Amino acid sequence: MMKIDILASGSGGNAIAVRSGSTVILIDAGIARTKIERRLLDAGIRPDEIASIFITHAHKDHVQGLPLANKYRIPVFATEGEWKDIHVDQELRRSFLKNEVATIHHYPFTIKYFRTHHDSYDSLGYVVTEDNGDRLSICLDTGHVDSDMLEAMHWSDIYIIEANHDPELVAVSDYPDSVKARILSDRGHLSNQQTAEALARLVRGRGERIYLTHLSKSNNIPELALATVEAVLQRKGYVNGKHYFLEVV
């Protein structure tokens, strides 16, 4: 049975461990290596058990812990253009080509990726399917959710998706105008409303588990993110705790 451990979430760093039986994969390694090691051990996972690390994109809050790969000789998957900002030994690098559609097998997992929209070379989301049919979609930094992304993520049992900000809080923040524009752009981050609207097209009321991640400490409030998603799903007749299960990480 698939088990999810969200080791870190937010602008300070992101890392997600996905495991079933003795197989463990890591999505992003965005906190210091020593912190990842400690949090893995707290979750009952030895770092040397990790089969592979899959990178969404090469911003610091997603890759700063990759010395973990060098220490434990863990293969790292990323798109080819991201390697200029990733410091991993050459023999551990596994590149996705820019226009390639690839499937990676780590029994009992099948891992596929889809393109997202962020201000990096070629950012990705991932869909992890267990051989029993359980399906996890991970969509972190992206400025919008398009139809291809929705198609890739549909019929998942678990969604880990960013709900980064509330636009009104961004507008009154102390951030420079250029940073505000970046956050709100189509290659920035999802607002609570954008996340809610995407989930409204994905959730089928089958008891899906939803984790809202990557919340901005300055431009969001957990209760606001929850309320926004719940309100949109309520319009479809779905109730949190009955038709789906929602929490903020």
How does the language model describe each region?
Residues 1-43, 124-141, 158:
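Conserved beta-strand hairpin/beta-sheet module of binuclear metal-dependent hydrolase folds
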Residues 12, 59-63, 83-85, 121, ...:
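Active-site environment of divalent metal-dependent phosphoester hydrolases
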Residues 26-30, 51-58, 77-80, 137-140, ...:
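Active-site neighborhood of phospho(di)ester-bond hydrolases with catalytic His/Asp-centered motifs
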Residues 33-78, 157:
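Active-site metal-binding motif and surrounding structural segment of the metallo-beta-lactamase
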Residues 64-73, 88-89, 220-227:
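Metal-dependent catalytic neighborhoods of phosphoester/phosphodiester hydrolases
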Residues 78-133:
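Metallo-beta-lactamase
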Residues 102, 106-118, 130-134, 142-144, ...:
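Conserved catalytic scaffold of divalent metal-dependent phosphoesterases
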Residues 147-248:
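Cap/insert and terminal regions of metallo-dependent hydrolase folds
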